């Protein structure tokens, strides 16, 4: 009988194994073993030729999404929060109707027929690898939906799976962001050769990663031929560029920076790092780079990097120490009017005050046109709109004050008592704080929300002592140069009884178990501290708040009609523009409806973002005169680049229309 695949076996060919028979006698029941012998026996699955995953053909599917019209006013629209917790799942009340059309390839379902089995068996791994490589190299005709944090392709995932992925990204170690996972291989020894010992594997050298050449959008060029690099440390060192600028201290921007970054064996010329004071101290703290290799740029002042080129650094409204840089080139011995102006935003959250400050510096040199703008295009997709930072901070702080004043039951309309109520001692509390507020944060960033809560509650900010975060926060508070945020080191404390607001890593708020683990760590600092707490409330600043249904855009082949519609959108947005940037305010009701009655700890997602929303970018591009806009994010998708370029052209049309009036 020839060997067959399991899909070729007929039911009639499967024989059951005979079971033991029992015979009974008049004297009692006696079990007798079956003496029947047969040449046939039951087969196990391992005896059949079952196709494995490596033999199966690889299929793909394409997704297309309907485009939705967007209203320029989001005043009456509640922000929908896509969990970043780690960018847990919450009940969303959304009434918008979303139409999603999924076009599945006919070859998506794999059907195995008798005449195909042999063909599948003959396919080798080399052939499959070749097919995969071909598929990777083929340009995808559908839009690639990426995670804004690690830029991984999420197109093949369902919506809830995309949310879960972003939860993992936000809660993971920032140093791992944007780096591919290592392939895990099983090493099987060859029977003809002895297996490698552990010592041999340990002593084997890892291959050296070949650094890529600096991409063009990382290099800024001036008329006199001078060149500088911005946020480009993970590439092959240039033989002619010695000035490197770091916009802020986030891992996706300083990646590649290390203590030996100026090693003469690797670098043809000695380099200098330019950054803000806070960023310089953090770089020195983390990488031990000598301060004599770092040039601190003063805030809101002109600094000359050559005899004819200057840079003005302004607050980027991102994380502490983040800056936007206005480079201006002048003719020798003529500094009245610059011949070239370049603006690099780094990562930034645009607002009306920032735009006015840039326009003021441009007006001082009698040249209001920027030749090139290197723009942070993280949320450069229609629909990525969220409230201003000021609105979110004020609303969340007001909510905490209301919760302290009225209590959880009255605030949420819940008569059920918290478990902490029964655990708490009946004696007077050892400190005056009944509710513990946990605010999620990155290595650096999101501190504004926690500090605003401290101001409302008149309490200090607690950070775990002897931690890297404590050292960083102390550095930020001691060297704060932002005139809008009057912070000082007296705000920070490591005494549990001086604070009811704790700054914690976002991963602490991922689940009830991780919060329990954090409270356990507090018990190690002081045994009786947790017993006096009645409630624990956490806030996850997500930034992923937008009108549902506008997240994904359908590709439109009619560029002319699309351009016309986009221009109208920009004109309408500018017509209804307000100076206070709070037309899309955040309301307490958005927090209250996330309440989970049966959860021991309440965790709320709030749409606090340190990146510019889509509408922020539109206002920025329509108000500033610029000849060319160069995106710095979402450049790995050709359609996305064209999509952004169309919007840049619309901004130019709007500027011309407004100037003609």
From Swiss-Prot:
Described by its record, this protein's role is as follows: Required for DNA interstrand cross-link repair. This requires cleavage of cross-linked DNA to generate DNA double strand breaks (DSBs). This protein has 5' exonuclease activity on single-stranded and double-stranded DNA, which appears to be necessary for the processing of DNA double strand breaks prior to ligation.
Binding locations of Zn(2+): 147, 150, 165, 169
Q: What is this protein called?
A: DNA cross-link repair protein PSO2/SNM1
Gene Ontology biological-process annotations: DNA repair; double-strand break repair via nonhomologous end joining; interstrand cross-link repair
Q: Where are the zinc fingers (UBZ4-type)?
A: 144-174
Q: Where found?
A: Nucleus
Additional record remark: Present with 259 molecules/cell in log phase SD medium.
Report the principal subcellular site: nucleus
Q: What is the lineage of its organism?
A: Eukaryota, Fungi, Dikarya, Ascomycota, Saccharomycotina
Q: Which family does it belong to?
A: Belongs to the DNA repair metallo-beta-lactamase (DRMBL) family.
Looking up InterPro entries in the UniProt record yields:
DRMBL, Rad18_UBZ4, RibonucZ/Hydroxyglut_hydro
What residue spans carry the region label Disordered? 1-44
Q: Which organism does this sequence originate in?
A: Saccharomyces cerevisiae (strain ATCC 204508 / S288c)
Q: EC no.?
A: 3.1.-.-
Q: Which Pfam families match?
A: DRMBL
Q: GO terms for molecular function, please?
A: 5'-3' DNA exonuclease activity; 5'-3' exonuclease activity; damaged DNA binding; zinc ion binding
Q: Per the entry, what induces it?
A: Expression is increased by ultraviolet light and agents which induce DNA cross-links such as nitrogen mustard and psoralen.
Q: Which SUPFAM superfamilies does this UniProt record tie to the protein?
A: Metallo-hydrolase/oxidoreductase
> Where along the chain is composition biased (Basic residues)?
31-43
Q: Which GO terms describe its cellular component?
A: mitochondrial matrix; nucleus
* Record keywords: DNA damage, DNA repair, Exonuclease, Hydrolase, Magnesium, Metal-binding, Nuclease, Nucleus, Zinc, Zinc-finger
């Amino acid at each position: 009988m020839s060997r067959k695949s399991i899909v070729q076996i007929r039911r009639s060919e499967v024989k059951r194994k005979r079971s033991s028979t029992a015979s009974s006698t008049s004297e009692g029941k006696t079990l007798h073993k079956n003496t029947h012998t047969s040449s046939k026996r039951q087969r196990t699955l391992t005896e059949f030729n079952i196709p494995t995953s490596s033999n199966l053909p690889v299929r793909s599917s394409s997704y297309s999404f309907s485009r939705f019209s967007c209203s320029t006013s989001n005043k009456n629209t509640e922000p929908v929060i896509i969990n970043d917790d780690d960018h847990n799942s919450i009940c969303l009340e959304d009434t918008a109707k979303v139409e999603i059309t999924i076009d599945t390839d006919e070859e998506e379902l794999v059907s195995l027929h008798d005449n195909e089995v042999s063909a599948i068996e003959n396919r080798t791994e080399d052939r499959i690898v070749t097919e995969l490589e071909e598929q990777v190299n083929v340009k995808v005709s559908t839009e690639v939906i990426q995670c804004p944090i690690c830029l991984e392709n999420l197109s093949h995932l369902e919506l809830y799976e995309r949310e879960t992925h972003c939860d993992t990204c936000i809660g993971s170690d920032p140093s791992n962001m944007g780096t591919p996972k290592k392939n895990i291989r099983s090493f099987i020894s060859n029977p003809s050769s002895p297996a490698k010992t552990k010592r041999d594997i340990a002593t084997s050298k890892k291959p050296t990663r070949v650094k890529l050449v600096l991409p063009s959008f990382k290099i800024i060029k001036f008329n006199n031929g001078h060149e500088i690099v911005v946020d480009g440390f993970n590439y092959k060192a240039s033989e002619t560029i010695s000035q490197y600028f770091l916009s802020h201290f986030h891992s996706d921007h300083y990646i590649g920076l290390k203590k030996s970054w100026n090693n003469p064996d690797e670098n043809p010329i000695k380099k200098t790092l330019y950054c803000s004071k806070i960023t310089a101290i953090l770089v020195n703290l983390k990488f031990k780079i000598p301060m004599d290799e770092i040039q601190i740029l003063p805030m809101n002042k002109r600094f000359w990097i050559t005899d004819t080129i200057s840079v003005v650094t302004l607050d980027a409204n991102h994380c502490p120490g983040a800056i936007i840089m206005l480079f201006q080139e002048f003719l020798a011995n003529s500094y009245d009017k610059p011949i070239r102006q370049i603006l690099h935003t780094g990562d930034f959250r645009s607002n009306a005050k920032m735009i006015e400050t840039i326009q003021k510096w441009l007006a001082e040199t009698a040249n209001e046109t920027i030749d090139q703008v290197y723009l942070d295009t993280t949320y450069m997709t229609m629909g990525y709109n969220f409230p201003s930072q000021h609105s979110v901070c004020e609303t969340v702080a007001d909510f905490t004050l209301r919760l302290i004043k009225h209590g959880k039951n009255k605030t949420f309309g819940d008569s059920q008592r918290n478990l902490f109520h029964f655990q708490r001692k009946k004696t007077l509390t050892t400190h005056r704080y009944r509710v513990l507020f946990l605010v999620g944060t990155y290595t650096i960033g999101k501190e504004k929300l926690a500090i605003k809560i401290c101001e409302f509650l008149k309490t200090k900010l607690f950070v775990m002592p002897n931690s890297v975060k404590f050292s960083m926060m102390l550095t930020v508070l001691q060297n704060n140069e932002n005139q809008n945020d009057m912070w000082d080191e007296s705000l920070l404390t490591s005494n549990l009884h001086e604070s009811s607001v704790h700054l914690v890593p976002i991963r602490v708020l991922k689940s009830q178990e991780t919060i329990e683990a954090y409270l356990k760590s507090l018990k190690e600092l002081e045994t009786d501290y947790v017993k006096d707490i009645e409630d624990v409330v956490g806030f996850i600043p997500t930034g992923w708040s937008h009108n549902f249904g506008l997240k994904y855009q359908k590709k439109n082949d009619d560029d002319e009609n699309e351009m016309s519609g986009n221009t109208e959108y920009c004109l309408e947005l500018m017509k209804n523009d307000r100076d206070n940037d709070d037309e899309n305010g955040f309301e307490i009701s958005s927090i209250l409806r996330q309440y989970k009655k049966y959860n021991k700890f309440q965790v709320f997602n709030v749409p606090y973002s340190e990146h510019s929303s889509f509408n922020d970018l539109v206002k920025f591009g329509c108000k500033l005169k610029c000849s060319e806009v160069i995106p710095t994010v979402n450049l790995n998708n050709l359609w996305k680049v064209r999509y952004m370029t169309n919007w840049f052209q619309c901004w130019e049309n709007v500027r011309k229309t407004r100037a003609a009036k």
